[in-house]
């Protein structure tokens, strides 16, 4: 790849909906110097043409993949700067505009699971940089033999809540020596949260790179030279935070360096 070539980054999502996440992720990749192409179960593309992969957020990973039966989950809220509110309002409006397509009639998406697990294995085998966002981080973990908590409400005791918000209302601690901490440049990070599940047992070769104070895993990475990162939050919805955009910059840089 020449210095002027823009690496091609595949971004996964559902067949119906997910347009706000796709547009924000594509924008982040473009700002980082790459090109983005959307991948779905109906349009899987050619993995060999990709220089890097983002496994996006969305519906829950089917617990069949880690040997469990489905449970049911719940939700909640939480508080924030003028810039945060402005960006959050714009992103929320985008998501609302596309929401009529985002209502999935099923809790799981087996065809998407199949495509994304194939792409994860391809990236790991081919040494391509891989970033998992929310569901994507969970699926990377499951693909490598890990498990999930289908509900994380028990982590939030009386007087606390699990704020589900595009705004950065959670604080996570970044593990010393982790790639994630180096990228974000601090010991802690403020992040958003749209998830009701989280990683439980780690998959092969993965380590925890971020946690909430209550122990909920918020970031994972694979040891070694290959870039394999997973974050439980949505950095694509935080374009106003430069440290969060470094995740996409590092992905594009690693794709270019292959």
Language model features: what each stretch is:
Residues 229-233:
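Active-site-proximal beta-strand elements of phosphoester/diester hydrolases
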Residues 179, 183, 192-194:
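Alpha/beta hydrolase fold serine-hydrolase catalytic domain that processes acyl esters and thioesters
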Residues 137:
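The feature captures the ABC ATPase H-loop/switch
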Residues 191-192, 209:
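Paired acidic/hydrophobic, glycine-rich loop segments that form the ligand-binding mouth/hinge
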Residues 1-133, 141-149, 153-177, 196, ...:
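N-terminal beta1-alpha1 cap of cysteine-dependent amidohydrolase-like domains
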């Amino acid at each position: 790849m020449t210095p002027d070539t823009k690496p091609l980054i595949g971004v996964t999502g559902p067949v119906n909906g997910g347009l706000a996440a796709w547009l924000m992720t594509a924008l982040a990749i473009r700002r980082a110097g790459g090109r983005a192409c959307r991948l779905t179960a109906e349009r899987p593309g050619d993995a060999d043409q990709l220089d890097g992969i983002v496994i996006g957020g969305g519906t829950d990973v089917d617990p069949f993949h880690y040997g469990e039966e489905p449970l049911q989950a719940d939700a909640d809220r939480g508080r924030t700067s003028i810039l945060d509110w402005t960006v959050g309002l714009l992103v929320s409006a985008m998501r609302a505009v596309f929401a009529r397509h985002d209502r999935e009639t099923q809790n799981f998406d087996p065809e998407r699971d199949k495509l994304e697990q194939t792409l994860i294995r391809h990236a790991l085998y081919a040494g391509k940089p891989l970033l998992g966002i929310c569901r994507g981080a969970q699926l990377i973990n499951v693909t490598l033999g890990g498990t999930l908590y289908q509900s994380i409400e028990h982590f939030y005791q009386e007087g606390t809540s699990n704020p589900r918000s595009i705004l950065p209302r959670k604080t996570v601690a970044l593990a010393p020596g982790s790639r994630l901490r180096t990228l974000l440049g601090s010991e802690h990070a403020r992040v958003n949260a749209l998830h009701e599940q989280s990683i439980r047992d780690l998959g092969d070769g993965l380590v925890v790179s971020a946690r909430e104070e209550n122990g909920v895993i918020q970031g994972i990475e694979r040891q070694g030279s290959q870039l394999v990162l997973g974050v439980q939050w949505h950095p694509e919805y935080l374009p106003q935070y430069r440290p969060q955009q470094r995740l996409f910059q590092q992905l594009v840089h690693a794709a270019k360096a292959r």
